[in-house]
Amino acid sequence: EKVEMLHSKTNMSSEGVPRLGIQDIKYTDGPFGIREENGDGFRPLGWKLDSATYFPTGSALAATWSKEMAYKNGWAMGKEGRLRGKDVILGPAINIQRLPVGGRTYEYLSEDPVLAARLSVEYTKGSQEAGTAVCLKHYALNNQETNRGSVNVIADERTMREIYLKPFEAAVKEGGAMCVMPAYNKVNGYYCSENAHLNNEILRGEWGFK
């Protein structure tokens, strides 16, 4: 039963434990809208009387420099997610904008770690107070799409903490983020999903993530 809970049941759900009354966890891959799953992918459902909201990209949201707007954006996403029966939004995407030509740079909030941190906190609070958990992504140092599954990002401790980890730290410690998604890349030689320094020492040990 524990193993079943730790991997996908479908493309966007994890197995529950019916014997204990634990329901499946249903995800939606934001971060700009609540998508509906169709079998193994995201083909059109063909619904005639339904549509989804397309929310602003991270860059557009950050351009407001408004904590209030970030909260409202998160709250609206969370509210729509709850109405559609979702438990977790796979977002916000809060990596630092490092490369202007990066394939997903538009998803991220800013090149400014303080701005990204402040807005991440408010978005997180808004969504979770509306009833849908966030899943912060991509932890950590996922700042390019080229070879994102294999690139080894080399960074010293001060650089990581002052720039790249700051939004994640704030969203966990101040926003109370319920989920964190590991990045595909390596950091200093270890894949993020099995990086003891990032996950055990910093995320759990220092920031108190549970």
Model-derived features: positions:
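Glycoside hydrolase catalytic-domain context in secreted enzymes
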Residues: 1-210
